[in-house]
Regions:
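SMC-family hinge/dimerization module
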Residues: 190-221, 231, 293-316
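ATPase nucleotide-binding head domains, primarily ABC-like/P-loop NTPase cores
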Residues: 286-287, 294-526
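Extended, Lys/Arg-enriched charged tracts that mediate electrostatic binding to polyanionic substrates
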Residues: 153-203
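Conserved amphipathic alpha-helical "coupling/scaffold" segments
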Residues: 1-150, 154, 259-262, 266-280
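Ligand-recognition elements built from short beta-strands and adjacent flexible loops
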Residues: 521, 525, 530-606
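Extended, Lys/Glu-rich alpha-helical coiled-coil stalks
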Residues: 58-66, 86-89, 246, 253-257, ...
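Extended, charged coiled-coil "arm/hinge" scaffolds of SMC/Rad50-like chromosome-maintenance ATPases
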Residues: 125-139, 229-250
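Long, charged, glycine-rich C-terminal linkers/tails
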Residues: 173-190, 280-303, 361
Length: 606
């Protein structure tokens, strides 16, 4: 699979966020190297695993689970007879603590068999060994006195001997006869032995062994004769202490080494669980759900939200391809959400293929694609010093080489960057060829020719991103079945362009363009009016007439989802007529209106 889509669709940003939610460094690397599920069955299995962990995360909260370093090498070293350091044993204890924490978390609530059972059953906690290591080793440099009876006894003797030495040295320091020979009234350590600082010129006045000289030569560090024997005793005790520490480390290392096969199996399971936990945490952040995976080349995203847009600002969209139509041509104003719709469709399908739940309604269905073929933006043309048009054509040439059954092709501003007539003709030809090759298609455009092509071609449907001409702001709502307008005249008039210029511009339009613009204006007007009343209305084929649907008698309510069906002639584009729907004033009931075009058995608009 071509992986360029990961950057273009911003899947890399989703993965980077998931990396931040991983606890272990190894899991972070696994997430960065994540590959899409190779088959539909694999995708379904991955999604059910993520969904199971997500449900437990919501129900039980986060497990007791901390970051650990890679320890399989440490265990293998112990298996071969190596002695582990205190720091390495603490890493082992932390890993064992993770095993215990995950096992306890999984068992907090009763549940039926889950697809993650094998992972959690693979965990083999060692609570006794974990506790012994944790209580015996205080830090990578310090072992607790209580690590063994022998160690406790040796350290007690060391402390007693040290106290005896300090008492004798304090007497020397306080003695008026000897303290005048000292540089400072302090006791220090040199070569593991307690000494006092003597002025160099009085070195013969304080009997004992010289162990060091200061850098200036003004001070010599003398071990007084009175403490030589006690210092030697301490050296002996410290050697015994180190031997006991080594014995304890050897014992722990042997126990760890004996666990190697089971430990490695548990460790691998822990990393996979950490990966799933990161995916589940991301799902909680995004309010995501598990979609179904279609057996056919078809997807249906309901109330889909782009995961990288602020949840307070993102507008959910409904996008479907592969059932009644295989190609969606999206039109509308710039910055109106056309490109976001493309990216949302591609990104959410791709996320599911990587085992992520998607920010869409749980009734959504995704498709398992072999390729995501994307031409969005001008990154490549900028890098290679190509014109915008040349950059697009270079990418589309590569797309044509790969497009086929079970591929999703997303084309932004198809045919842009060249002569409009040639660009539109080329865009239609590209769409037709990609359809012949069997790819599902979504394309954005400003060309009226593509809107007409979508109206006239079975399997191709218009969609538009709505624009509020009063506020001059896009609503970001995607309306499938209705082509969009550029709104150039309305926007220009709102911004102060004289009306005579607008009128002159209209006269320069061809008759066909005028008719299409009129149809689009009426459809858009109906749509905006209907949205305000929570009802959808479109044209009837009654020549020159107005269809009026009267509400039930006063005091009655409209049954929920009452459906009114209109059938319009195939020549709708040449004769758009108004419709009036009388909405009951006593409630907020919804009326569903279905519009059938020509002899089509399914509604074109609903």
């Amino acid at each position: 699979m071509d992986t360029a889509y990961k950057t273009t669709l911003e899947l890399d940003k989703v993965l980077n966020r998931a990396v931040q939610l991983c606890a272990c460094q190894e899991t972070k690397e696994m997430m960065q190297a994540l590959e899409p599920a190779p088959t539909i069955e694999d995708e379904r299995y991955d999604l059910t695993q993520t969904n199971a962990i997500n449900a437990l995360l919501i129900k039980n909260g986060s497990p007791r689970f901390g970051s650990v370093r890679e320890v399989r090498r440490i265990v293998a070293h112990a298996r071969k007879g190596g002695i582990l350091s205190m720091g390495e044993l603490l890493e082992i204890a932390a890993t064992l603590r993770n095993f215990s924490g995950l096992s306890q978390w999984y068992g907090l609530s009763e549940h039926e068999m889950l697809p993650t059972d094998d992972l959690f059953f693979a965990l083999a906690p060692q609570p006794v060994l974990e506790k012994q290591i944790s209580e015996s080793i205080l830090s990578p440099e310090e072992m607790a006195d209580t690590a063994s009876v022998t160690l406790h006894d040796l350290r007690r003797k060391i402390r007693q001997t040290e106290d005896s030495i300090r008492t004798k040295l304090d007497n020397i320091i306080r003695n008026s006869t000897t303290n005048k020979f000292l540089q400072d009234a302090v006791v220090s350590l040199r070569n593991g032995r307690y000494v006092v600082p003597v002025r160099a010129e009085y070195r013969g006045e304080v009997g004992g062994v010289i162990h060091d000289v200061s850098s200036t030569g003004a001070t010599v560090f003398v071990e007084p004769t009175a403490v030589v024997e006690a210092n030697a005793r301490i050296m002996q005790l410290r050697a015994q202490e180190q031997e006991e520490i080594t014995r304890i480390l050897t014992s722990f290392s042997t126990q760890v080494g004996s666990l190697e096969p089971q430990f490695t199996y548990s460790y691998d399971a822990m990393l996979k669980i950490d990966l799933l936990l990161a995916k589940a945490r991301l799902a909680v952040e995004q309010n995501a759900f598990m979609p179904a995976v279609s057996d056919a080349v078809h997807f249906k995203l309901n109330k889909a939200r782009h995961p990288l847009i602020d949840k307070k600002k993102v507008v959910p969209v409904d996008i479907e391809l592969g059932s009644e139509y295989d190609t969606l041509v999206i039109t509308g104003p710039n910055t109106g959400g056309k490109t976001v719709s493309l990216k949302t469709a591609g990104l959410l399908n791709a996320m599911a293929q990587y085992g992520f739940l998607i920010p869409a309604h749980e009734s959504s269905i995704v498709c398992h694609f072999d390729e995501y073929l994307v031409d969005i933006g001008d990154e490549q043309s900028i890098e290679q010093s190509l014109s915008t048009f040349s950059g697009h054509m270079k990418r589309i040439s590569g797309i044509l080489d790969l497009a086929g059954h079970a591929t999703l092709t997303l084309l932004d501003e198809l045919g842009a960057g060249t002569d409009p007539a040639e660009g539109a003709a080329l865009a239609v030809s590209i769409l037709e060829q990609l359809r012949r090759q069997g790819s599902l298609l979504m394309a954005t455009t400003h060309y009226a020719e593509l809107k007409v092509y979508a109206l006239e071609t079975p399997g191709v449907v218009n969609a538009s991103c709505e624009f509020n001409v009063e506020t001059l702001m896009p609503t970001y709502k995607l309306s499938v079945g209705v082509p969009g307008k550029s709104n150039a005249f309305l926007i220009s008039a709102k911004l102060g362009i004289p009306q005579e210029i607008i009128n002159a511009a209209r006269n320069h339009m061809s008759n066909d363009d005028k008719r299409l613009d009129s149809v689009l204006s009426q459809l858009e007007s109906y749509k905006l009016t209907c949205d305000a009343a929570d009802v959808e209305v479109v044209d009837s084929d009654k020549p020159g007439g107005t269809i009026v649907w009267q509400s039930p008698a006063s005091g009655e309510t409209v049954p929920e989802w009452t459906t009114i069906k209109f059938r319009v002639s195939a020549g709708l584009a040449s004769s758009a007529l108004p419709i009036t729907v009388d909405i009951p004033q006593n409630g907020k009931d919804i009326v569903k209106v279905e519009i059938y075009v020509g002899d089509e058995p399914n509604p074109q608009y609903s």
